[in-house]
């Protein structure tokens, strides 16, 4: 409907646009489109043999019997097989079948697209016709305008001297504005059956800049995947030079697609990237491959890299999952690189390990079975690939059942680890854990636990493992494990500052006999560290190869506060070993003495604006901070800051490489300084010095990398510029600056 309450600014803007948009007026017209509730639709339905009959209504109707011309005046509505027309005046020549409509015209097709015009000439089928000063608003988004448009019986629209945009043409106040981008063309053809728009003699307009000529092309509407060129990227860095990325997507089927992406560099040979993905009724998979030829450095340690001859280099990344039945599924992933620096040199990934897995699983309410295989490729400097284990196979079976008022879980597990240049291990065990949970009349939650396990190991080449405590004994070994525990929680609830608080003291007693831990190898329980998440665990080692065999008492408390718009959760605790026998836990883990270190966690959340988590570990003797970890997020979706700080000061022996101390700072943030503009940045800084790592050569402030950028994003375009700097050399992945430009347009590669 026509609005009479427009602001003066809107009126001025409309006047300004009127002068420049006389040929292709993309602004909305002051007329409501006909709807399915129009009066014409409430007329008596046509008889089955009159399916082609036109229904209409009007304020007045004139009929000239001599010329057989019908003239409908005042808010005319016509309907025929899903096509609806609204106009001020309609003249219908029944002899020739010619229909001419004028004044506030709006035509809606069965797909929901609405066409506006000054005048329209139709056949009496309402299927084809010619429109002057045409505007088409597509149901699936976007609009087209033309000096003249023609519609054919199959629904195809042909527009001459036309323009197209998927962008909004009004600001939040309803005032008209130029779209962020549009395409003008000598001819635009819209095929509703294909959901595509075809352009001939086109020009690309962006933010009012001089237009760029375009070749003949087409693009999809409605957000469906269609073949075509995707959004390009531009990047400049020290090693590869200027990079142009121009992906092209091939829609092979409704559920299959292939994307070919050439990466063209100014300083090195091009690289090709291909990604194939398919979705089926039972699952999906995706595989990506990169390939090029370039020089690489096999020496990752020296300051001055040494180059080899040119070599084929590449990377494969794939993932798949299929649900074979309601209970059975198969999944897998593959990540393999030709060498250790390829991913970093071409800015693909900075992961230091690549995992390849395959798994067959069965899951039902009380049973779990998995057959899994693992392969790990190391990307780390001075980490021989031959020492990386190949886990094939790993079988894990678990069964839950009710027993004696409690819950019994049975488990059987086997694992074979093979190394090409290291220790080989085969392991099998069967275990059972029974838990009985009860609530007392005073509100205490009491849990009784019994655990038993029988292990069998077979180990070869133990002397190839450098850390003696990880080796175990050569050959076949067996081990029996048993433990019992009682865990008591006593929650107290009350009011606090207009909200509620809950204080829960907790005490746990665990008893376990001496276990032959060092007789078997340690493959999966090396990175042991006391923290709040494992304080009350039955076994505070991470894996199965080591089990904490001392009897101990663990005590602590949880405190939570819930206020309007805010929550606070805190936990703190410590353990005391009841037996005096020596422990296998390394010094520095917080568990090596009879009294453990004190660990805790505090989490503060204020609505969706503030989230702060602090984890800590305090030395039991002088309360020195052995672990200090803070993760904070403050802000909204558009403007926020994220900070992470970690300092591990545990004084662990240097030969235990899985538990090295370090200190680092991570910062990231985004600031929206205008409606569509934002600036962002992130950095990682290594703060490690000899206080944390005696072997460190760092001065305590070594930036690893940083990233700073600016981005514009509205409803139909995303444009960004990013500067990234890497500070560390690794072979041919050199330090230096890189610059990235990104451009993504709605319906054009986005």
PLM segments and residue spans:
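Gram-negative bacterial Sec-dependent N-terminal signal peptides
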Residues: 2-22
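N-terminal amphipathic/hydrophobic interface segments
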Residues: 24-161, 182-190, 195-197, 260
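Short, Lys/Arg-rich amphipathic segments at extreme N-termini
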Residues: 11, 15, 57-61, 486
